[in-house]
């Protein structure tokens, strides 16, 4: 049984590879035919960090505009957020600031990481590592390059965000991470809104 429960969000434009990152991390699975998320996708993975069992409860949110008002309901209580863009898609990179400035995101007291995905597509790449790091400095976020296809840096980003969350909380705040509210996620209101939720768990 996990000692702590951390709620992690994957946020960004549609088709940047958020779902692929989720499945690569939790199931070590990748498919070129991954279907875009409708609503939200939820999976859980238990890791050991500093000799403690930690459950990462990971929410992959749809980047499609028509689901925006629904998926924002899932932002509440997030401990960590990945802002994901596609290094072959300039618009997805430029839209990071849009995602960062969403009111529901601004209100979050959480650790945030900038993620440039699809670095395996070297010939199609339009956003350099230097440009990504420059943005990271401007918006005060740690930045990582990843490839859901090859698995490069995927495990590292999830470990890093867990480390950041725990290192930036007081002892009392860390104790609050062991919460029944985190274990038994309430999704009744979202389900009644017609949001698709896939709940899966893997240790």
Give the positions of each predicted feature.
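Conserved P-loop small GTPase signature centered on TRAFAC-class small GTPases
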Residues: 1-15, 19, 49-53, 108-203
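Switch I (effector-binding) loop of TRAFAC-class P-loop GTPase G-domains
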Residues: 26-53
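Switch II (G3) loop of P-loop NTPases
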Residues: 54-67
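Conserved Switch II/interswitch segment of TRAFAC-class P-loop GTPases
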Residues: 78-97, 107-110, 119-126, 149
């Amino acid at each position: 049984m996990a000692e702590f429960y951390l709620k992690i969000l994957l946020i960004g434009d549609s088709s940047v590879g958020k779902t692929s990152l989720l499945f690569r991390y939790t199931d070590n699975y990748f498919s070129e035919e991954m279907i875009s998320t409708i609503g939200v996708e939820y999976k859980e993975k238990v890791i050991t960090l500093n000799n403690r069992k930690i459950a990462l409860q990971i929410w992959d949110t749809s980047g499609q505009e028509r689901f925006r008002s629904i998926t924002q309901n899932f932002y509440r209580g997030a401990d960590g957020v990945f802002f994901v863009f596609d290094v072959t898609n300039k618009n997805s990179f430029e839209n990071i600031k849009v995602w960062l400035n969403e009111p529901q995101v601004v209100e979050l007291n959480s650790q945030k990481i900038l993620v440039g995905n699809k670095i395996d597509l070297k010939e199609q790449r339009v956003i350099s590592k230097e440009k990504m790091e420059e943005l990271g400095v401007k918006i005060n976020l740690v930045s990582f390059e990843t490839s859901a296809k090859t698995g490069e840096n995927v495990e590292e980003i999830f470990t890093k965000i867990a480390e950041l969350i725990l290192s930036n909380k007081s002892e009392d705040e860390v104790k609050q991470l062991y919460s029944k509210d985190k274990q038994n996620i309430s999704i009744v209101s979202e389900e009644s809104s017609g949001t698709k939720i896939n709940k899966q768990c893997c240790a």
